[in-house]
Every structure is written in structure tokens, then in C-alpha cells.
A protein has these predicted regions:
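Bacterial N-terminal signal peptides that target proteins for export
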Residues: 2-11
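Alpha-helical scaffolding within the catalytic cores
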Residues: 31-36, 74-77, 206-212
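Active-site catalytic motif of lipid deacylating hydrolases and related acyltransferases
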Residues: 35-135
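Disulfide-rich extracellular domains of secreted proteins
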Residues: 62-65, 69, 80, 84, ...
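Serine-dependent carboxylesterase/thioesterase catalytic core
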Residues: 119-235
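C-terminal catalytic-base region of ester-bond hydrolases, centering on the histidine
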Residues: 213-311
Length: 311
């Protein structure tokens, strides 16, 4: 059978369309929640979110971006808190050591950990150390590498209480490969602080060894840990693959090896990426548990691990 010229061109055109689609910049949406405003009075709650590594085809960390803010995950967490009458402000950051960088896959410049550290330093000065100012409660949200950054932030700020930490399948894979060059050229740690490049190193906790990103510091009152599926399973509404390509298996622990204040959910239908979407089984669990914990704030409860929490 002889194909006409149009039929012969069809596979080429389809391949070209796929290539062009892969090169097309991603559409990024700003969170709908009020943005962090360090020039104004403090809100009741601040939610800081750090996204993880970009999905293929991309080149990390150059093409990493703040997808938790864009896809509505940050808004979902902020909304669960705001629904109980709290004034909430949010800020989202990308998986990078740099303060600002321009990925090829998105149009808008992205802000990395150095920007988060600078924002946090201003927050401490204006809202936590200024006399007569009631500081906000702090909530940390991280996915994949983002959880490495949020754990590091809490670890190097032991004088600041965090009301809640949310870990969505925190992963250390490619941490050193992605970040060692930028962290060597632009260190983000203050003098005397642990190095950020060591945030995935193994440390002894109790009788075992775990990575630093799996340690929940004592200045964090509660930790909600999500892990993605281990076995092949049909996907949920948030999409993903039948077979998971990357997943966390280590359980978060306290520095003494206990699990005090830590809750865990294994999402048996969702892969590493799918758990980060607002319509996922994982986020449904996170939002339910967040709402329950926030209800406890109204009663003035404080964790025994963190007696200095803002009532």
C-alpha cells in the first residue's frame, strides 16, 4: 500500500508537536490567598511552601518552579486554616539555593531558599522580636526536595516555634547533585549554622541512623507526613502513573527517636507527583488533619514539645 504525502508526513508532524509542547513555557498561576506582606502588620498565620524537583523533560535545578503555589496546593492548606477564622498570608518558593533565577520552562522568575531565608529573617525581626507585636503561627509545607528545605529552615531557627510542618513525600534523591555547585558559590547558612548541602546527611537518632530531612525538630509542634504508594495501583483523581517511580519509606522521627506529634499517611493510589495536587487523597487527609489541629489552636492548646507556641 502506498501512502500519500500527507499520510507520510503525519508521524513527523506528531513528533514535532510533542517536541514543541515540551518546549512551551508552563502557565504559572499566583496563589489566590493573601501574599506574605512583611511591610504590614502580622497575620494570624503564615504558610511557607517549598516545591520540589521539576518533572521531565526538564533540567534541575535550573527549571524548578513553585508548583505548589501554582496548582492550588498552597491555597488549599491556607484555606483550611482561614476557614476557621484566621487571617492567613502565604509565600511559595522553588527548589533552588538561589534567591532568584529564571527557569526555561516558566515565564516568571522563581525565588529559591535564599529568598525564603531572607524573608524569614525579616519576619523574625519585625514580627517575632519587635516589642508589642503578636507573632503569627507558622506552617511549613514541602514536597519532595521542598521538605528538605523546610526541615532545614526549622533546624537552623531553633528559637522560632512552628505550629505545623507538612511533608509530602520528602525525598533526598539528587540533592547533592542538584545543589552542591550553587551552595558552594552562594552559601545560604549563617556562620555557625549547619551547611545546607548536608541537609540529607545521615545522623544518629536513638539507636538508628536517619537523614536530617527525616528529623522533626522540637520547635515544630506537629508534623503531618505523607508518603506515596509503594506498589502498583490505579490512580486517583490527581493523576500519576500506575507504577510509582520514586517514593519515601523512612518514617519521620523526633531527635530522641520518638514519633511524638507526628502523624503519617501512606497514599496507596498516588505516586510521588500525584500526592502534591489539591484533589489528591493525600491532600484530603492533610486538610482534614490540619482542620482538626487548627481547631485546637482556638482552645489555646500548645504542644508539650513546644510550650512557647503562640496561643
Amino acid at each position: 500500500m502506498t501512502l500519500n504525502p500527507a499520510a507520510r508526513l503525519l508521524p513527523v508532524l506528531l513528533a514535532l508537536a510533542l517536541v514543541l509542547a515540551g518546549c512551551r513555557p508552563l502557565q504559572v498561576f499566583a496563589p489566590r490567598s493573601p501574599a506574605l506582606n512583611l511591610a504590614g502588620p502580622p497575620p494570624d498565620v503564615v504558610v511557607l511552601a517549598v516545591s520540589g524537583r521539576c518533572g521531565p523533560p526538564c533540567r534541575a535545578p535550573r527549571d524548578n518552579w513553585d508548583y505548589l503555589g501554582s496548582r492550588g496546593t498552597l491555597d488549599a492548606v491556607a484555606g483550611a486554616i482561614a476557614a476557621q477564622g484566621y487571617r492567613v498570608q502565604v509565600a511559595g518558593y522553588a527548589d533552588s539555593a538561589l534567591a532568584s533565577f529564571q527557569p526555561l520552562k516558566v515565564v516568571a522568575p522563581q525565588r529559591g531558599y535564599a529568598a525564603l531565608a531572607a524573608d524569614f529573617a525579616r519576619m523574625k525581626a519585625h514580627w517575632f522580636r519587635a516589642p508589642g507585636v503578636r507573632p503569627p503561627r507558622l506552617v511549613l509545607l514541602g514536597h519532595s526536595h521542598g521538605s528538605v528545605w523546610t526541615h532545614y529552615l526549622a533546624q537552623v531557627n531553633p528559637d522560632v516555634p512552628f505550629a505545623l510542618m507538612i511533608d509530602l513525600d520528602g525525598i533526598c534523591a539528587s540533592w547533592n547533585l542538584d545543589h552542591q555547585r550553587d551552595l558552594r558559590a552562594h552559601p545560604v547558612e549563617a556562620p555557625g549554622q549547619p551547611r545546607a548541602i548536608d541537609a540529607c546527611n545521615l545522623v544518629r537518632v536513638g539507636r538508628g541512623m536517619v537523614r536530617l530531612k527525616d528529623v522533626v525538630p522540637l520547635n515544630v509542634a506537629h508534623d503531618l507526613e505523607v508518603q506515596s504508594k509503594r506498589l502498583p495501583a490505579y490512580r486517583s483523581d490527581s493523576g500519576g502513573f500506575f507504577v510509582n517511580y520514586l517514593f519515601e519509606v523512612t518514617l519521620n522521627v523526633r531527635p530522641d527517636g520518638s514519633s511524638a506529634g507526628i502523624e503519617r499517611f501512606v497514599s496507596v493510589r498516588e505516586d510521588h507527583s500525584a500526592v502534591s495536587y489539591p484533589n489528591s487523597d493525600a491532600l484530603k487527609w492533610v486538610l482534614e488533619r490540619t482542620a482538626s489541629l487548627v481547631a485546637g489552636w482556638k482552645q489555646g492548646s500548645a504542644s508539650p514539645l513546644n510550650p512557647g507556641s503562640v496561643p
